[in-house]
Amino acid sequence: MSMPVKTITTEKYQQNFSLAKYLEANVKAPLLWSSETPNLYIIVLTLKDHKGNVVEARSSRIGFRKVEFKNKHELCVNGKREYIYGVNRHDHDAWEGKTVPYERMVQDVTLMKRFGFNSVRTSHYPADPAFYDLCDEYGIYVMDEANVETCGADAELSNNELWLFAQMERVAGMVKRDKNHPSIIFWSLGNESGVGANNAARASWVKDYDPTRLVHFEAYMHNGGSRQYGYGIDFMKTNRPAVNPPEPPAVDVVSTMYPSVEGIIKLATQEGETRPVLMCEYAHAKGNALGNHQEYWNAVKKYPRLIGGYIWDWVDQSVIRKDSVTGKEYFSSLNGTNGLVFADRKIKPAINECKKIYQHIRFDYSNGELTIRNEYNYLPLSTFRFSWKLMAGGELIKKGAVSYTHLRA
């Protein structure tokens, strides 16, 4: 596939920065990319002069996948329904602070996969490009979030046209930089910056530039100390006429923060709204939290419009220091211990609860029979190794393994 540079440069545009041309080619039956099957290809772009000499060449890994909402509310990747088993992630390292080394990013992604997470939100700014490469490779869905936040000013700047360019520049920069990563399925316009015309403008640009992904924005405002959604309507009330956000065409999902289980059920069953409901922040993991995490997921699996959410958050924002007297190391933090893992990536008990709830292979024992149910979209049971133990009073009675040849998909 080739195109002469002259074909591009001779077309007339009013401004140079809008100079563009699309190259299109049909790829027959590619292996599709998903969180379960992160199949990647390498595309190579070569620029040659009029004599055929190579002037420049660039390569990039890409993946083929389709993201959509079927039946208006079912999140589907390649036609298969998906739930967001997600977590919010800040850039943080116990030794280097906000300068996160590559090996720590690898550790984050592998731990997320190990404990059943399939998605991450880059709260509240785009991540290091290397992090997206890892998500592409390992299979992690990404909500890529622009660094637009006016927490404390509520919607003041989102309704001020003087701030539109600054906000638009940050969103556009993120989308243009990260657009080739198959792991990114959501563009997020920012965080906690209220409802306003600037939000709608940013969303419109994103949808025009990249119609292949979904647009997210959780816009909340404060009123008398309580969270208010939509046109000042408390979403917990049963007579609410609108939900967050109030520009229905602008975003693809109703997003909420820290709702109760009853709250998300009310959002998911409200009349006059068909969009899916996502908890972009929930299950605040400070201390020994997540005690009712199962109840949230019982609701998610019961009510069709609920698609999951992102736990707050992944890693404690603390740094390792040495005691001046004893010389012992300790974690120093100013109230930033909200993570499922410690700052050095040692796990906390709550993350095991997540692994249990998110597991895609279910075991049901009744009437002397064990039923194994596979909830993966692409991975057959033969992909896994099964071992078992029979215990009585804490003592091992017998153990064994099940041959994968006897397991159906």
Regions found by a protein language model. Give the residues of each.
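Substrate-binding/catalytic cleft of secreted carbohydrate-active enzymes
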Residues: V109-M112, S119-L340
